[in-house]
């Protein structure tokens, strides 16, 4: 059966007065439990910790210093998980909490540990409930919004479906018509962020497009009507669908969509052609190096015009690459005083931007 990631935001979980909507959590839990009983594997990405923290601490507004907001998230996360545990208990399902930050995806070993944990929880029959680890998040390591966290989880877990639940039916065009299938040339109606959420419809689009590019079928739909999930799985389209590309290999999916990049390598047209023909990146095709990186880091590869060609794991540091760029491989064996390959990025460690 299918592997499904479902993301629910604060706009659905929080009432207008700031309280967590317990009845909605019960209905969401019933829906996910039903999916699991049909043989599907599910992961829930939830927001709402900050709002729950405000309620527990009896704070009246959202304007607080960062350290207070982080403390409120720590308070609220406990309350939120209590509600989920009680709700899923009603349907004889067990849950597990996972708190994630951006670095957990960006470093490959931590990403593999996270993925193995998700696999293990599903094998044991637990439903993972994930949220960003707001208490330690900084601007450098934050997702910015749980839509992005959901997309990265779906990519890393090699999910079949990603549902981004919204307070509207899906994406609307500039004529106020529902867009059934997203294409990059659609003209969207402008929509606003909610009080309790940190993202908007643009973030949902970015998340769904990233997941679909990695082979995950996406849907932005109305979370007030949770039957939309079952209907989409049955082949209907109650929201806005995002058609998936072919799934890349697991390692290349990590390189292309989850890794942190430490710099850039600028290449000429000959190197671009070679990479598009699934060949390795050699020193002769490099015209510039930007940033500082070490062996094993991930870098972006761009043309002199700024076009992003892909990402790859480098076999040389930035200083080494600067020293050998432009040289033919045959010239480098003696200069480097080393045997073996002189390719900067091997084709097996390179992710090519989909056309």
Q: Where is each model-derived feature located?
A:
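C-terminal catalytic "cap/lid" subdomain
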Residues: 1-94, 98-355
């Amino acid at each position: 059966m299918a592997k499904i990631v479902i993301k629910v935001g604060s706009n659905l979980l929080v009432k207008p007065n700031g309280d967590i909507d317990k009845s909605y959590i019960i209905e969401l839990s019933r829906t996910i439990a039903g999916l699991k009983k049909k043989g599907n594997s599910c992961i829930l990405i939830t927001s709402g910790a900050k709002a729950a923290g405000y309620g527990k601490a009896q704070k009246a507004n959202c304007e607080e210093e960062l350290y207070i907001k982080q403390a409120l998230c720590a308070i609220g996360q406990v309350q939120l998980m209590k509600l989920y545990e009680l709700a899923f208990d009603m349907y004889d399902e067990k849950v597990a909490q996972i708190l994630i930050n951006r670095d957990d995806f960006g470093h490959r070993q931590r990403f593999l540990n996270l993925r193995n944990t998700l696999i293990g929880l599903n094998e044991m029959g637990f439903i993972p409930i994930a949220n960003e680890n707001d208490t330690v998040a900084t601007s450098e390591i934050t997702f910015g919004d749980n839509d992005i966290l959901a997309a990265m989880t779906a990519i890393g877990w090699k999910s079949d479906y990603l549902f981004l639940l919204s307070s509207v039916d899906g994406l609307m065009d500039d004529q106020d018509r529902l867009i059934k299938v997203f294409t990059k040339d659609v003209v969207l109606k402008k929509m606003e962020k909610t009080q309790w959420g940190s993202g908007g419809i643009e973030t949902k689009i970015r998340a769904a497009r990233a997941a679909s590019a990695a082979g995950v079928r996406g849907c932005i739909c109305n979370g007030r009507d949770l039957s939309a999930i079952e209907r989409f799985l049955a082949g209907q389209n109650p929201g806005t669908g995002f058609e998936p590309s072919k799934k890349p290999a697991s390692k290349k999916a990590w390189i292309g969509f989850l890794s942190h990049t430490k710099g850039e390598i600028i290449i000429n047209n000959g190197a671009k052609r070679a990479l598009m023909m699934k060949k390795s990146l050699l020193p002769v095709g490099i015209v510039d190096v930007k940033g500082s990186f070490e062996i094993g880091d991930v870098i972006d590869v761009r043309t002199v015009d700024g076009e992003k060609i892909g990402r790859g794991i480098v076999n040389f540091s930035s200083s080494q690459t600067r020293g050998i760029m432009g040289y033919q491989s045959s010239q480098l064996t003696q200069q480097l005083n080393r045997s073996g390959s002189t390719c900067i990025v091997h084709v097996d460690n390179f992710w090519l931007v989909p056309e």
